[in-house]
């Protein structure tokens, strides 16, 4: 749920982008590049990773006018399940992040020593005028410093440009990469909004990137949570958990505690977001009898671990 972003977007010290940035955590993005480039290297591997990073950064920079109609149609065909829209349709980060394109070019220049005409046996089929980017290996600490400076500059310029102090990012997979994000952005803090696993599964099954089958969506959810919970202690005081149900039951106390965690002053405007429809317990009406029995059995241990009631217990905040 992005309810916390809606809450804290009302704070005068907080800036919240209206979308996920995508270039940070998606395949071929900054974290993917960071975790792979220094662990294994060959000229071909390096070129492939550079090309993927460059393609992703270009795709999210700005949408061309010619793409808007087909993208609009694709997104309305089963919400993109029938026909996938163009990659990153609608993303135009250059409109929001100051000098985004210039910083991207500067980053790529720092990574690539030179380019030359050439092709690998595995170069994409029928590439016109193929080119190879030669990117020499970098020590992990050198790569970390380079990428950290890139991200820090991007985000600090955004905050200066908008006259805010704190940037609130709502990234779907951020909690899976807390350690890596902390290495590149050591001042970052992470908030994990917990929710009844069965309600999360009900929500997941309606997303175009998740299985529609709710039992499959349960396995999807459990793998995510196992990884997140295994690493939550690594962040120490920079990681904070809060239940959606607790936020709804006592918003003032919950938001005050989050403000303290973020180093923000509490203001009354944060309570103006409507929290009356959290869809708590939605799984009871959306799951059929077989799904309820199967999924309750699958998430039994996770319910206990997270402190949520089992099938026949009532919810306690």
Over which residues does each language-model region extend?
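Conserved substrate/cofactor phosphate-moiety recognition/catalytic segment
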Residues: 15-43
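Conserved nucleotide-sensing/catalytic segment adjacent to the nucleotide-binding pocket
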Residues: 35-65
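Conserved helicase/translocase P-loop NTPase motor core
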Residues: 138-180
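PAPS-dependent sulfotransferases, especially Golgi type II membrane carbohydrate sulfotransferases
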Residues: 71-72, 78-145, 205-208, 225-241, ...
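Conserved phosphate-donor/acceptor-positioning beta-strand/loop module used by diverse small-molecule
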Residues: 170-171, 177-205
